[in-house]
Amino acid sequence: ESRVILESMRKAKGGYGKIECYVGVENRKDALRGANFVINAIQVGLYDPCTIIDFEVPKKYGLRQTIGDTLGIGGIMRALRTIPVMADFAADMEEVCPDAYFLNYTNPMAMLSGYMQRYTGVKTVGLCHSVQTCSEDLFKQLGMEDKLEGRKELIAGINHMAWLLEIKDKNGVDLYPEIKSKIDEKIADPEFGNKVRLEYIKNFGYYCTESSEHNAEYNMFYIKSKYPELIERYNIPLDEYPRRCVNQIASWKKEYAEMLEKGVKEHNRSNEYASHIMESIVTSTPYQIGGNVLNSNHLITNLPAEACVEVPCLVNGRGVQPCYVGALP
């Protein structure tokens, strides 16, 4: 069925390329043989039962989560059940496509990408769309859409917690003073849902890439059993993610059935990095991404060398080349 949909998409784009279908672990080497790029987007254990267990077991012991896919109990459990599968991927790739790039979209991003980079010989870069949507979402929330065009930014840190270190308009003017002048009104709005990240700006001076929903569980400031009023004050959606998954899966099934029945008439390129990386390497056309790579060259000087960091990377015919950032504030 997936092949039928892909063939429909291929025809919608003029019929270029060739689609081959391989099903099952026993056919994986044949699928990988001679590949230049391998895109990884998997969930080991699926939503049911594993995501449910990731939430329900910690909850019994008073540990509350919002997403549970990055760190903490939920993130660690995801990593532990996914790393063995990634190790099998890596072993096959080292044998049948040793020069291929492994483009990883699977969470927990830093743990899994870091594993591949530290313990396998596979060229790996981790990809997350929170970098390219970061400043645009912030500007739209603050009514600063007029500053979107031509803006210049620097984002670096670790996945889901990289920092908008610099943000300037097309003329090079620092936009943080204007941003900071607008955030108190938003934080005071009881209906506004992005308060945690705006609090970061107030207290730390910088905005963070991933959502307030994610960031609420990354530190000790917001989800506290002795201060339940913080949940309401910051609009923190505890246990919302499992419910959202149910609705999302139902929506995907409906969309899948419609594509299978009607075909795909139109397919537009998104801002996800994978296709741009492949195009840049094959055509030697420069492109910049935010990638998750090892900090072995001290790209961020005050994070450990063995850490997996999210930094600007130049992509061209030579591959993915991480850029030096320096120290985080």
What are these regions (language model features)?
Residues 96, 101, 105-171:
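Rossmann-fold dinucleotide-binding core
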Residues 20-32:
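Short acidic low-complexity segments
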Residues 39:
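Flavin (primarily FAD) cofactor-binding/catalytic cores of flavoenzymes
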Residues 140-329:
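Long, compositionally biased stretches enriched for glycine and/or charged residues
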Residues 35:
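An anion/phosphate-binding loop that grips the pyrophosphate of nucleotide cofactors and donors
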Residues 1-17, 28-29:
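Glycine-rich phosphate-binding loop and adjoining beta1-alpha1-beta2 segment
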Residues 44-119:
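Rossmann-fold NAD(P)-binding glycine/threonine-rich loop
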Residues 30, 47, 110-113, 134, ...:
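Flexible loop/turn segments at secondary-structure boundaries
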